[in-house]
Regions:
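Catalytic phosphate-handling regions of large nucleic-acid enzymes and associated NTPases
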Residues: 1-139
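Gly/Lys-enriched N-terminal cap/neck module of very large, oligomeric protein machines
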Residues: 139-202
Length: 202
């Protein structure tokens, strides 16, 4: 339950968080569950609870009723993203942009066409050439956003989905050790925004 709650809290949509909840950009883990606090966000209270249409069942001790499922007023699965695997089958639903989902939902209600593509908290560049509208067999390619500061300096300001700054820096170090790159040093200045400075050998 703790890991699932942290995963929800890091998406910054359903849970108002307090304490150290870790960082999906750097890969830093959250504090132990007893050291973090959570409450449902105002958004969650608005879209996740609709008493007239919510089916319930008795709680484990029979004293209260608890919801079997929460019918959403918002395409939460597309916003959060999800992945899973079973015997011979797997699925991966990539996260999408909150505002784009709202606009697309309005288009559906108006019975008008729309296009929507995945969007990631960590930023990065995405190639949706072979996305296939999210259907089976579709794929996307993501990469870091790299700016050339000068001929000896590169700056990374966003990273691919499911990659951390720590993992990215490790891969740069390995490339340097194998001779694919010639790096003088790497500065990780990531705080509120991602910033990795790569100083190349002159």
């Amino acid at each position: 339950i703790g890991d699932a709650l942290v995963n929800l809290g890091q998406k910054d949509l359903l849970i108002d968080t307090q304490g150290n909840w870790g960082d999906i950009r750097t890969g830093d883990r959250s504090a132990a569950p007893r050291y973090i606090e959570a409450r449902l966000s105002q958004f969650a209270l608005e879209v996740a609870f609709n008493k007239p249409i919510t089916e319930t069942s008795p709680s484990y001790d029979g004293r209260k009723d608890e919801p079997i499922a929460l019918p959403m007023k918002f395409p939460l699965l597309l916003a959060q993203g999800a992945e899973g695997i079973a015997v011979g089958l797997s699925t991966k639903i990539l996260p999408h942009n909150f505002n784009e989902l709202l606009r697309s939902s309005i288009q559906i209600l108006k019975e008008k066409p729309f296009k929507i593509f995945p969007d990631f908290q960590t930023g990065g560049l995405i190639d949706v050439t072979h996305y296939n509208n999210g259907k089976r067999g579709g794929k996307v390619r993501v990469r870091a956003h790299i700016d050339i500061v000068d001929k000896h300096t590169l700056k990374i300001s966003s990273i691919p989905y499911n990659t951390t700054t720590t993992h990215l820096i490790d891969s740069i170090v390995k490339a340097n050790n194998s001779g694919k790159l010639k790096v003088k040093n790497i500065e990780d200045n990531t705080a509120e925004e991602i910033e990795i400075i790569i100083n190349l050998v002159k």
